[in-house]
A protein has these predicted regions:
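N-terminal pre-domain/capping segments
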Residues: 1-102, 125, 136, 170, ...
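Histidine-acidic metal/acid-base catalytic patches
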Residues: 1-32, 159-273
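Short amphipathic alpha-helical segments at helix-loop
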Residues: 73, 77, 112-116, 218, ...
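Conserved beta-strand positions in the central sheet of alpha/beta enzyme cores
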Residues: 37, 67-69, 105, 143, ...
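Active-site-proximal loop/turn and secondary-structure-junction residues that shape catalytic pockets
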Residues: 9-11, 40-42, 71-74, 108-112, ...
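A generic structural signal for short coil/turn motifs at secondary-structure boundaries
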Residues: 12-16, 77, 115, 152-155, ...
Length: 273
């Protein structure tokens, strides 16, 4: 199992330009990571010259970009906005293909009060299926996540409640969409991750390793200092034969120190399996 990192603690630095993507990749390589993850928020254009420059810089750093994260809002009550979201996602898929990014994490949408659970499930599943058809034109694998709330949104994820997540997940089983399984988001709902993992393990392609301060509370902390049963999850994955990427979602707010300690913790756990 290889290890990459989505550097949530560095989002402000990277999105503002204080830290370049090349510098992030070079730093991750020095720490020991096998790859890096990016947010679409970090990419400021989709012109060919810009993307060629970004790819050259990342290639010089010598680490693959494993996963990009994006934030489609397919449960928006306005049909015109939902179409915009679909078009934005199609662009993101093409952009990932051009940058050589293997995985693109996708979401259901936000929990809009005007949209019922039944309507939201239908809308999310329909649009994700359409996005899968777009991804099929490229070398990009879409990954759906049991997600909570990104900074890019004002509301929590519509499918944050695990029962809603399962309803959408079940409607995607005949598509090419696989899963990015997030440990911390389940703990934040005061649920145990292992039983949830058992339900979806045959569709898990990557794992977001995150940690929370307590069950029932969305409060990210340094990886290995919280209550998430990370070691138990890794043992079960190994027993299943999982050989995919462990994508650390480092959101403790401790910057590079937190990102380095997260790698040491997960690296040691993997070596002990």
């Amino acid at each position: 199992m290889k290890i990459s990192c989505l550097p949530v603690s560095l989002f402000d630095d990277i999105c503002s330009g204080r830290m370049s993507l090349q510098a992030w990749a070079e730093t991750a390589k020095e720490i020991g990571y096998d790859g890096i993850d990016l947010s679409m928020l970090m990419l400021t254009a989709h012109t060919e010259t810009y993307l060629q420059r970004i790819r050259r810089e990342l290639d010089r750093a010598g680490l693959p970009v494993v996963m990009a994260t994006t934030y489609p809002d397919f449960t928006h009550p306005d049909p015109k906005q939902r179409q915009r979201e679909a078009d934005y996602l199609a662009r993101d898929i093409a952009l990932c293909d051009q940058l050589g990014i293997r995985y693109l994490r996708v979401l259901a949408g936000q929990a809009h009060q005007e949209v019922s659970e039944e309507a939201g499930v239908t809308l999310a599943a329909e649009h994700l299926r359409q996005a899968d058809a777009v991804a099929g034109k490229y070398t990009v694998q879409l990954l759906y996540e049991n997600h909570a709330k990104p900074g890019a949104w004002s509301k929590v994820d519509f499918s944050y409640p695990i029962d809603i997540f399962f309803r959408i997940f079940d409607q995607l089983k005949d598509t090419g969409i696989l899963l990015n399984f997030d440990i911390g988001n389940i703990v934040a709902q005061n649920r145990e991750p292992l039983p949830i993992l058992e339900r979806v393990i045959d569709r898990v392609e990557t794992v977001h390793i995150s940690d929370m301060s307590a069950y029932g509370k969305f409060d990210p902390v340094e990886i290995g200092t919280g209550v998430c049963p990370i070691q138990d999850i890794l043992k079960r994955l190994k027993g299943y034969g999982f050989q995919g990427w462990l994508c650390i979602e480092e959101a403790s707010g401790h910057g590079l120190a937190g990102i380095a300690s997260a790698w040491r913790y997960v690296h040691n756990l993997v070596n002990e399996l």
